[in-house]
């Protein structure tokens, strides 16, 4: 049976390679599965799996290179970032940012990968071409989120246990500020104008809005879905619509997605999604968003214009991150 599975997977991968070897924007959906040690590849029209890529142990965060020909995957328990060629769906290289890389980002020029090393309480800067660590900066306890500012000058790092965000100058590799936020800060985004940085605080149950000029927390956004206890509201994933008007926050154990007006900072709506809503990603046209549900091993698809759930499809065990080649 295992031989048959390998043969079928090879056929799928070969067909993908032949069809898309010179194409941009295949539409393929990639989902990292922490407990299956794999990346599920799905058809963008049917949401059916068409291939499974064996990865290193515990694949988590994923990021694209600039033209989306390569997908970088953090294999945390193997202490490496794997590079997947989209045309062939095969691993073609590695980057080694020291132990236990969980989240990472890549500078706009595609040269430097910046990763959080959760067990070592530091962040590593890696020259991608040379696969060489060029700087390591101490952080608070359990660094996680890594988000580069829109102008490419600064990187913001969340430190879960220390309850702070570190703001680091990328060119000089120097820490500019340490901003106290809520309990267990996790993921974040910048508004399109770069003036605000929004970060989820999982245990505190709110989002901190940080002014990127003053490095001060300027506002907090709380969530109160009807019928749920405060302790069940655990925001983790966060993203912003490509038009910059609406933010989407996954509320973890609340099994909800919150829709927040970016201008007013007011929650407009809650949608029921899967178990332990963990991450959220957009199609590039902003028409659909995808909520990764790590507790139910599936992904919820939402029509952004109608603000309603249109489908839920299964993936691997304990999905972490979803990326779309569009």
Where in the sequence are the language-model features?
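Sec-dependent signal peptide recognition
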Residues: 1-9
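Predominantly soluble domains enriched in secretory-pathway, periplasmic, or organellar proteins
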Residues: 11-326
């Amino acid at each position: 049976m295992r031989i048959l599975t390998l043969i079928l997977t090879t056929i799928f991968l070969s067909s993908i390679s032949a069809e898309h070897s010179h194409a941009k924007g295949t539409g393929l959906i990639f989902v990292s599965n922490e407990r299956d040690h794999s990346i599920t590849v799905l058809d963008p029209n049917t949401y059916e799996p068409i291939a499974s890529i064996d990865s290193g142990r515990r694949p988590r965060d994923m990021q694209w290179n600039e033209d989306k020909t390569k997908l970088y995957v953090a294999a945390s328990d193997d202490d490496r970032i794997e590079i997947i060629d989209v045309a062939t769906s095969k691993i073609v290289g590695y980057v080694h940012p020291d132990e236990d890389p969980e989240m990472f980002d890549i500078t706009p020029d595609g040269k430097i990968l910046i990763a959080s090393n959760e067990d070592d309480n530091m962040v590593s800067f890696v020259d991608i071409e040379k696969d060489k660590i060029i700087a390591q900066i101490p952080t608070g306890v359990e660094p996680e989120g890594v988000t580069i500012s829109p102008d490419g000058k600064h990187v913001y790092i969340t430190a879960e246990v220390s309850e702070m965000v570190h703001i680091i100058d990328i060119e000089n590799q120097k820490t500019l500020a340490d901003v106290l936020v809520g309990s267990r800060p996790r993921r974040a985004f910048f508004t399109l104008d770069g003036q605000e940085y929004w970060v989820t605080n999982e245990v505190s149950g709110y989002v901190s809005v940080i002014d990127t000029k003053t490095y001060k927390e300027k506002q907090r956004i709380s969530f109160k879905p009807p019928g749920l206890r405060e302790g069940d509201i655990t925001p983790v994933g966060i993203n912003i619509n490509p038009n910059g008007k609406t933010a989407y926050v996954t509320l973890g154990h609340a099994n909800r997605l919150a829709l927040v007006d970016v201008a007013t900072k007011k929650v407009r709506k809650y949608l029921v999604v899967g178990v332990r809503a963990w991450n959220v990603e957009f199609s590039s046209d902003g028409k659909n968003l995808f909520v990764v549900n790590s507790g139910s091993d599936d992904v919820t698809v939402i029509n952004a214009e109608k603000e309603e759930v249109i489908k839920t499809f299964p993936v691997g065990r304990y999905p972490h991150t979803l990326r779309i080649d569009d």
